[in-house]
């Protein structure tokens, strides 16, 4: 199982974005129009493709950290999801469920409950939404989210063992698992017609 940490991902993105461009050492061309026509036109391939709608749900475990993340994602996290437009798209990626937003009080983080283990579908991680959600959650609540990402089989193993506090997975995959003893509550989270390519 691969372990992905949002802070590591964010640091890699910052390092990549901060790299200086190598100086242009090519000799200047006498005819700028000839140089422009010789250079291939660069177009970035889209990172997302439209297709069938995929719904994601949150499966809440029994810890205070699970409850805290669940309430936060279903309240403040909805604002971030509603306006999330990743590079490669011109419109918000996710639509929200019709359900009302959570109004419960978020349990305070303690030394014993501060770490929240989150097992997430790889596509949620790759879309970039977790890099938006989790740092904001940590900042607002004092909890620390530890991310584990994988496909349906990895999430099924996490669910069976109860190793994660929260599962963020495709609704169809969760339905296939049936009753999960470690995760008593399930909530619709977001849906999208886009998939990461």
For each predicted feature, which ranges?
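N-terminal segment of the mature folded domain
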Residues: 34-51, 106-197
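Bacterial lipoprotein signal-peptidase II cleavage site
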Residues: 19-27
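Bacterial N-terminal signal peptides
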Residues: 7-16
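A bilobed periplasmic-binding-protein/Venus flytrap-type ligand-binding module shared by bacterial periplasmic
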Residues: 51-65, 72, 195-197
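An extracytoplasmic/periplasmic, membrane-proximal ligand-sensing/linker region
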Residues: 86-113
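Periplasmic-binding protein-like
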Residues: 70-94
């Amino acid at each position: 199982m691969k372990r992905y940490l949002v802070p590591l991902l964010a640091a890699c993105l910052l390092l990549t974005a901060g790299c200086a461009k190598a100086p242009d050492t090519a000799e200047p061309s006498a005819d700028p129009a000839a140089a422009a026509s010789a250079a291939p036109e660069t177009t970035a391939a889209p990172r997302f493709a439209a297709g069938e709608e995929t719904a994601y749900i949150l499966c809440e475990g029994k810890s205070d950290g699970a409850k805290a993340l669940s309430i936060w994602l279903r309240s403040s996290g909805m604002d971030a999801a509603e306006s999330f437009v990743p590079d490669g798209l011109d419109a918000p990626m996710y639509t929200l469920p019709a359900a009302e937003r959570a109004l419960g009080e978020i349990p305070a983080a303690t030394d014993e409950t501060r770490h929240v283990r989150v097992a997430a579908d790889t596509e949620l991680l790759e879309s970039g939404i977790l890099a938006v959600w989790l740092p904001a959650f940590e900042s607002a609540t004092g909890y620390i989210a530890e991310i584990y990402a994988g496909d349906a089989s990895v999430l099924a193993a996490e669910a069976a063992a109860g190793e994660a506090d929260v599962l963020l997975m495709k609704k169809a995959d969760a339905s296939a698992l049936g009753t999960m003893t470690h995760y008593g509550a399930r909530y619709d989270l977001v849906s999208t017609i886009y998939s990461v390519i």
